Amino acid sequence: YERRAIIGVSVERSRNTKTSNTQQTIQFSVNHPTLQINNPRQEIKVVVLKNENWNEKITNLQPTFFKANQLLYTYTNKTNFWGDNEYYNFDTKFLRNRSLGIQQIEKKEVYHHYLYPENYNKYKKYTYFPDINGQFVIRTLEANDAEIEADYAMMHFSLNTYQPFSGKEVYVYGAFNNFELTPENKMSFDSENNTYRASFLLKQGFYNYSFATVGEDNKVNLRTINGSFYETENQYTVLVYYKSFGDVYERVIGVDTGFLDQNR
């Protein structure tokens, strides 16, 4: 992109007392000392993106303050995101041996890896454990070039619940399929064991995943199963687009990323 602006991003606990325990707010500035912006409300567009997931974004923001060569975006509520929770992890760098998150391995037409079941608890409290914000890294310790030599394993996911979530579908959710909801990662409910299950192939690597519900509004919801906490360490990216009068297309003139600092 064409770097014509310097972006400063701050991630904080929500300032709204009603959401201070469950949401995070993003404040940012756009500094443009070498770029003349005549009408920022028309020439500038911004996108705030959570964890590189285009399903979780905020747009249509206008500056709240104007300074010389600087635009400030200091909303109280409009740039709030749900904190959600840390992602679950597993590692399949070994096909034949158990690694992080793997409870059992079976050799069939391909290797089948059964993850430790997760348990639904509506009273779940926040517990820190490191993740990579829903992303994944292809890797194997059984070959030299993971990108072309890593193999596939059938991954088995399970979520123990007391009963099915009424009016909601449940999905395994993560960047492994670009945060999409497909028949492949949709979970089915095993009524005999009160367990949601899903199985699909994934290439060897280190993966983050979560569980998402989708109701009649067709909106992805990570809070139903995992809760939402202001402490969760999320990554937020601010992209700034510029289109002056007479330009044919918008240009990205600035990008920056911010993280929640739990020690703040």
Predicted segment positions?
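Low-complexity, Pro/Ser/Thr- and charge-rich linker/hinge segments at domain boundaries
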Residues: 2-25, 229-254
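Short coil/turn motif common to extracellular beta-sandwich-like domains
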Residues: 19-27, 149-156
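Short edge beta-strand/loop segments characteristic of extracellular beta-sandwich folds
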Residues: 27-35, 156-162
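Long, internal scaffold/assembly segments composed of regular secondary structure
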Residues: 37-124
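Aromatic-rich carbohydrate-binding modules that target alpha-glucans
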Residues: 53-68, 156-203, 216-242
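Basic K/R-rich, polyanion-interacting modules in nucleoproteins and related proteins
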Residues: 113-166, 253-264
